[in-house]
């Protein structure tokens, strides 16, 4: 059974390619051009109209810039004035965009984001995963909000690389620290890209679940 799948906010095509490898009709969508090498699978447009179509599965990676807890200090109006007010408006827009996927008319939906404000603005995620549970030795706490889908089962738990510590006493995951030398736009892409092990697990486990569900008529 071939499934029709929309992977929203994914210029890397990391997840899209894994579903394609299993024979499914998967499309990445982003306002940016694809960087995964398959423009024929990429819908470079606003995702809103696409959500009106029929999809067997929607996976969304909405931008986290204004949703993550790490940026909370920039919302201090007394300290940052108009810049903070602008970020507050941008955060409202980001929440509304996230909720487009939460309210999408599809039986099977997954939304991915780092730990952030959506846990209180909407609801807590169904699951929090890390790449090191799926064969990639990296730490990147990732939240999944699921509709009609099972939680991902770890496929290969490995030891994550040691965190990078700084003179200030602060630390960050090794992969994240390695991104700092990149230009801001490239750094953003690297930080948001889905690790291979997680992409493979999403494609295999969720497609199998949906096919089983459709076959059994539930």
Language model features with spans:
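Conserved active-site and SAM-binding loop architecture
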Residues: 1-218
